[in-house]
Amino acid sequence: MLHYSVVFLVIALIAAVFGFGGIAAGAVEIAKILFFLFAIMAIVSFVVSLIKKN
């Protein structure tokens, strides 16, 4: 489960670079939505992995 947290975090960071950096000017809103979506998924899977570990 921790593996998924890292994957979601990396995807969120890539979406942030494209969305907030202005690289993909036409897809800024989509990149911003993807950033927040994958950031939330990373946090949730990290918390679940901590709960399952105990």
Curated annotation (Swiss-Prot):
Keywords: Cell membrane, Membrane, Transmembrane, Transmembrane helix. It is a multi-pass membrane protein. The chain crosses the membrane at residues 6-26, 30-50. It is found in: Cell membrane. It comes from the Bacteria. Pfam families: DUF1328. HAMAP family: UPF0391. Belongs to the UPF0391 family. This is UPF0391 membrane protein Pnap_0920.
